[in-house]
Design a protein with these regions (language model features):
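Amphipathic alpha-helical coiled-coil/heptad-repeat segments
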Residues: 106-152
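DNA target-recognition domains and sequence-specific DNA-contacting regions of bacterial/archaeal
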Residues: 1-109
Length: 152
C-alpha cells in the first residue's frame, strides 16, 4: 500500500485512492481482479479493476472472491450499497470504513450462471453509457466552438 504523496502521474500502473481520478505509479502492489473501495470519504462507490495496480493505504481491495460469486456480479451489487456504507462508516471528522462493514454485507447468493447473465446485461449498459458520455462531450465541445465563433 502506498501513501498518496508518493504517487506519480506518468507511471504505468494504475494507483487507486479515494479520488475519482486514477493516478499512475511505476510499481504495482497487486495483480488481481479486484473491487476497490475508498476507505474514507463522504461517498463509497466501488471501482472494478483486473490486472496490475497500486493501492493507497486508505483503500480496500476485495479480491480472491469465493467461487460462488463472480467478481463483476459482486462489483455491480456493491454499486448499489453506497447508502449502506455511508450509514455504517465511523468517525466524527472523516467517515471511514472498517473491514467489519464489508463482512456484514448481505449479498444475494444466486446461481453463478444467473450472475453471468446479469453481468453481460449490465456490462452492455455500462458500455453504452460510457459511449454516450463520450458523444455528449464531443457535442459540448462542438457547441462551445460554434458559440465562440458565431458571436465574434
Amino acid at each position: 500500500m502506498q501513501d498518496a504523496s508518493l504517487s506519480y502521474s506518468d507511471g504505468m500502473y494504475p494507483f487507486f485512492d479515494r479520488s475519482e481520478d486514477i493516478k499512475f505509479q511505476p510499481e504495482y502492489l497487486l495483480d488481481k481482479e479486484a473491487i476497490i473501495y475508498p476507505g474514507e470519504g463522504s461517498e463509497f462507490y466501488p471501482r472494478y479493476y483486473n490486472g496490475k495496480f497500486a493501492l493507497h493505504q486508505r483503500c480496500y481491495a476485495i479480491y480472491d472472491i469465493a467461487p460462488n460469486f463472480a467478481t463483476r456480479y459482486l462489483y455491480f451489487f456493491c454499486k448499489t450499497q453506497n447508502s449502506y456504507f455511508v450509514r455504517n462508516a465511523v468517525g466524527s471528522t472523516v467517515a471511514s470504513l472498517r473491514l467489519d462493514t464489508f463482512k456484514r454485507l448481505n449479498i444475494p447468493n444466486i446461481p453463478i450462471e444467473l450472475q453471468k447473465t446479469y453481468i453481460k446485461l449490465l456490462d452492455k449498459i455500462e458500455t453504452k453509457i460510457v459511449d454516450n458520455k463520450i458523444v455528449l462531450k464531443k457535442y459540448e465541445e462542438q457547441k462551445r466552438y460554434l458559440l465562440s465563433n458565431l458571436f465574434i
